[in-house]
Curated annotation (Swiss-Prot):
Listed name of the protein: Autophagy-related protein 8
Removed propeptide positions: 117-184
InterPro entries: Atg8-like, Ubiquitin-like_domsf
Organism (species): Laccaria bicolor
Main localization category: membrane
Function, in words: Ubiquitin-like modifier involved in autophagosome formation. With ATG4, mediates the delivery of the autophagosomes to the vacuole via the microtubule cytoskeleton. Required for selective autophagic degradation of the nucleus (nucleophagy) as well as for mitophagy which contributes to regulate mitochondrial quantity and quality by eliminating the mitochondria to a basal level to fulfill cellular energy requirements and preventing excess ROS production. Participates also in membrane fusion events that take place in the early secretory pathway.
Cited Gene3D superfamilies: Phosphatidylinositol 3-kinase Catalytic Subunit, Chain A, domain 1 (3.10.20.90)
Keywords (A to Z) from UniProt: Autophagy, Cytoplasmic vesicle, Lipoprotein, Membrane, Protein transport, Transport, Ubl conjugation pathway, Vacuole
Site (Cleavage) residue list: G116, Q117
SUPFAM superfamilies, per database record: Ubiquitin-like (SSF54236)
GO cellular component: autophagosome membrane; cytoplasmic vesicle
Residues carrying lipid (Phosphatidylethanolamine amidated glycine): G116
Lineage: Eukaryota, Fungi, Dikarya, Basidiomycota, Agaricomycotina
Keyword Protein transport found: yes
Location within or outside the cell: Cytoplasmic vesicle, Autophagosome membrane; Vacuole membrane
Length: 184
């Protein structure tokens, strides 16, 4: 997505502003947040944010939701370089990995997974108990588990909607599928 902020402000001015901000507030991240094209989600009232470096992506999404007065039942997705970042990631880590050459972090948001691909991805699951945990956590998002019962559940495959890059987490030996911001 092309940034309107970049179109409206020359590179030298953006870079100088970001450097000034980083010098004055070294524990803050300069973020430009813009609505993605072709989405019916409300437009945010301001684009520039100084985000604490220890804020998580999920907490930042909460700030955006409040700024645009989005109803709790409505989905919101944020993208950095057209990728859904993990909600538990610190904004400082996202900044270090994805900051622009002008030293701003560009974030876009949408009511749909506009950069996701259509289709499905299969993920092998080695334990049926783990597979049921996945299904119970994400059943309203069309997650299915296919198992070959003739092989005593040894060949289970978790099938999930392809959301850019599905993220797998293992916590206490439980497998869970992160659907980025669907649960925020």
């Amino acid at each position: 997505m092309r940034s309107k902020f970049k179109d409206e402000h020359p590179f030298e001015k953006r870079k100088a502003e970001a450097e000034r901000i980083r010098q004055k507030y070294p524990d803050r991240i300069p973020v430009i947040c813009e609505k993605a094209d072709r989405t019916d989600i409300p437009t945010i009232d301001k684009k520039k944010y100084l985000v604490p470096s220890d804020l998580t992506v999920g907490q930042f999404v909460y700030v955006i939701r409040k700024r645009i007065k989005l109803a709790p039942e409505k989905a919101i997705f944020i993208f950095v370089d057209e990728v859904l970042p993990p909600t538990a990631a610190l904004m400082s880590a996202i900044y270090e990995e994805h900051k622009d050459e002008d030293n701003f972090l560009y974030v876009s948001y949408s009511g749909e997974n506009t950069f996701g691909q259509e289709g499905w991805v299969e993920l092998p699951v080695d334990d049926m108990d783990k597979a049921f945990i996945c299904v119970s956590a994400a059943k309203k998002h069309w997650v299915w588990v296919l198992c070959d019962v003739r092989s005593s559940y040894q060949n289970c495959v978790l099938i999930v909607p392809l959301v850019q890059r599905p993220v797998l987490h293992t916590h206490s030996s439980f497998l869970s599928v992160s659907f980025a911001l669907l649960f925020v």
